[in-house]
Amino acid sequence: MANNNSNSPTGPHFLFVTFPAQGHINPSLELAKRLAGTISGARVTFAASISAYNRRMFSTENVPETLIFATYSDGHDDGFKSSAYSDKSRQDATGNFMSEMRRRGKETLTELIEDNRKQNRPFTCVVYTILLTWVAELAREFHLPSALLWVQPVTVFSIFYHYFNGYEDAISEMANTPSSSIKLPSLPLLTVRDIPSFIVSSNVYAFLLPAFREQIDSLKEEINPKILINTFQELEPEAMSSVPDNFKIVPVGPLLTLRTDFSSRGEYIEWLDTKADSSVLYVSFGTLAVLSKKQLVELCKALIQSRRPFLWVITDKSYRNKEDEQEKEEDCISSFREELDEIGMVVSWCDQFRVLNHRSIGCFVTHCGWNSTLESLVSGVPVVAFPQWNDQMMNAKLLEDCWKTGVRVMEKKEEEGVVVVDSEEIRRCIEEVMEDKAEEFRGNATRWKDLAAEAVREGGSSFNHLKAFVDEHM
């Protein structure tokens, strides 16, 4: 069925294919580095879209010699820019993008697989991220084993699995009744605030739900599908057992570069150096989430009224939309800029892991993207959880209720239907993390930091799981 490495004198050759989003690229590249750098004889070809490469979404420097890079076309090599405003036009634009990526991606990756075979460097296993089921199809066409790299917590994988396997009606009913809850096998009690937003029919991105159904159905076509997950055994032990045994769950995280040498400097680091230990709020909502103008105003008010020093990262998201389509986030806060600059610092980019490991950081106000969530745990930093969409809702619940490293903001729906967290609520959460329960939250965060470090070092749970996965392809 599959290429057996016994016929290849050079060891296993893994093909990694990642969806063109930062939350997929970062953990994929880290896993590729670990395979190429720590597993004897393993080689990796890391394939990202041409658009991701052109936007410099990852670095090709300082990688093992056995890791090489390749590209595939997603049909939008200059980047996908949507001019969609309505839900219908947004759905159509995204659908067209996914269809074109499937068509062009299959063409270019087919060439890559065939070229490597001709040069006697055949791939022996394909690893792909969420939303790329066509890569699994391509692997089957070439009789190659494949593994899904799930870049969210195993708890979220379990929710999607159960939704599509017997619990769809129950979860949908719960999602439409705000006061109700549901208990899925081996998972904590869930409310509508906790489930991935794609499952809620009223959510503007609910049209993406079929892509996750396709993902689960694709896995079921395999006899014993393997799912590599960016988590570690000690973090989600109950959720590991919530999926049927024929789905082989392989926790290999946290897939972060656990650096201890922070030689990089910048103006923001010099600014942090002047602040007292655990005194600074670090605020970041990632590279995708765009806050409404009303929400930005409330956040500005909260930061100004708290009078605590803060470092706020507002990334440039203009590449996602056509020019002048909407007011930039930085422009939205211009009327508050003078007051903000008196207390804190607003930057367009920072080395987040470097910042989270700075002695001055006392709290991370985060959108709860999974990479950021893991970085908060690995750095031992308490959080104010401020989720926006998809898995971030569940990540926020895990941080607050299960791992107990912070608090989650309580949003409210205004008359016009807009969901906003007001400044008073943001301030309340900040004070709880920085003052009222600071010692408790930091103690819990430090515990997870130590467990994460143990998991990835030689002999740790994630190290051993990854080695066992590679051994299957030796």
From Swiss-Prot:
Molecular function via GO: UDP-glucosyltransferase activity
Family: Belongs to the UDP-glycosyltransferase family.
Name recorded for this polypeptide: UDP-glycosyltransferase 75D1
InterPro entries: UDP_glucos_trans, UDP_glycos_trans_CS
A single BP term in Gene Ontology: response to toxic substance
Described function: Glucosyltransferase that glucosylates kaempferol. Can glucosylate the phytotoxic xenobiotic compound 2,4,5-trichlorophenol (TCP).
Residues binding UDP-alpha-D-glucose: 287, 350-352, 367-375, 389-392
EC number: 2.4.1.-
Keyword entries, A-Z: Detoxification, Glycosyltransferase, Transferase
Recorded superkingdom: Eukaryota
Organism per entry: Arabidopsis thaliana (Mouse-ear cress)
Phylogenetic placement of the source organism: Eukaryota, Viridiplantae, Streptophyta, Embryophyta, Tracheophyta
Keyword Chaperone carried by entry: no
